[in-house]
């Protein structure tokens, strides 16, 4: 499992390219996680809340590789940050602190157990 930690301040190439300039945030909430392809889990800090997930197909190669845009709202600063991660649609299964599922490209919230 390969997970890359991306500080928001070092995330300029992603933010400025697609979503405008990077916003400043508190040091407590300045870390988000980006997932490389072919991993089964995404790890998101507890203080991050996953609001929505929209996807765009950039290359439809082999077993449907997608580029996902994760919309994450940080609790502390209430900033909405968009990051991308490369993942296989069928490998993207859950999030450590908030388990989520993908059905037909839609994000499903889990039922409380």
From Swiss-Prot:
It comes from the Eukaryota. This is Uncharacterized protein C343.20. The lineage of its organism: Eukaryota, Fungi, Dikarya, Ascomycota, Taphrinomycotina.
